């Protein structure tokens, strides 16, 4: 399961133009 905080970090990375890392980010 992915935590909401982790998803927020992934979203921020995507919006920032960088490649998100972490198992949760791979599901986006």
Curated annotation (Swiss-Prot):
InterPro entries per record: Bifun_inhib/LTP/seed_sf
Molecular function terms, GO-annotated: lipid binding
Keywords associated with the record: Lipid-binding, Transport
Cited SUPFAM superfamilies: Bifunctional inhibitor/lipid-transfer protein/seed storage 2S albumin (SSF47699)
Function, as annotated: Binds specifically fatty acids. Possible structural role in association with these lipids.
Family the entry assigns: Belongs to the plant LTP family. B11E subfamily.
Name of the protein in question: Non-specific lipid-transfer protein 2
């Amino acid at each position: 399961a992915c935590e909401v905080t982790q998803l927020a970090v992934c979203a921020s990375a995507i919006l920032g133009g960088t490649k998100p890392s972490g198992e949760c980010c791979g599901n986006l």
